[in-house]
Design a protein with these regions (language model features):
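Short, flexible helix/strand-to-coil boundary loops that buttress conserved ligand/catalytic motifs
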Residues: 21, 52, 73, 115-117
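N-terminal beta-strand motif that seeds the catalytic metal site of vicinal oxygen chelate
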Residues: 1-18, 45, 57-59, 108-118
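A short, local hydrophobic-aromatic micro-motif
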Residues: 3-5, 30, 81
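Positions that flank functional sites
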Residues: 36-37, 88, 114
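Amphipathic alpha-helical segments
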Residues: 13-28, 72
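Vicinal oxygen chelate
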Residues: 13-15, 60-102, 106-111
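Conserved short beta-strand elements that form part of the metal-binding/catalytic scaffold
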Residues: 26-57, 61, 94, 101-108
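Short loop/turn microsegments at loop-to-beta-strand junctions
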Residues: 5, 34, 89-91
Length: 118
């Protein structure tokens, strides 16, 4: 049975992006060795991997209290665009220290998070 997901963000500055998830978003992590942090996500994992050339990904983190998260980003001088309203939620694009981007959104729709058996 599948118990979760492992998300990989390829990064041109993995150390800086790891620090962002650890220090700004305060995601708990385990050290997989040699500084490779694996972050806990409900119910998935998030890892930073170095990239050669163009890095690409699309990751949106769901935030039931988006305004509070934006206040934290502002306090840490993290650049972001938005918020903008979409049919499915309020959307923000966040610039990671490496220059890659992730999205944050506060959903307006029912979520499936509670459907996974625990």
């Amino acid at each position: 049975m599948i118990s979760g997901a492992h998300v990989i963000i390829y990064s041109n500055d993995a150390d800086a992006d790891r620090a962002f998830f650890r220090d700004v978003l305060q995601f708990p992590a385990v050290d997989a060795g040699r500084g490779w942090l694996i972050f806990a996500l409900p119910p998935a994992e998030l890892a930073m991997h170095p990239a050669e050339g163009d890095a690409s990904h699309e990751l949106f983190l769901m935030c039931p209290e988006l305004k509070a998260v934006l206040s934290t980003l502002q306090a840490h001088h993290i650049r972001f665009e938005g918020p903008t309203e979409a049919r499915w939620g309020t959307i923000v694009h966040v610039d990671l220290p490496s220059g890659s981007r992730i999205g944050l959104y506060q959903p307006k729709h029912p979520t499936a998070l509670s459907l996974w058996p625990r």
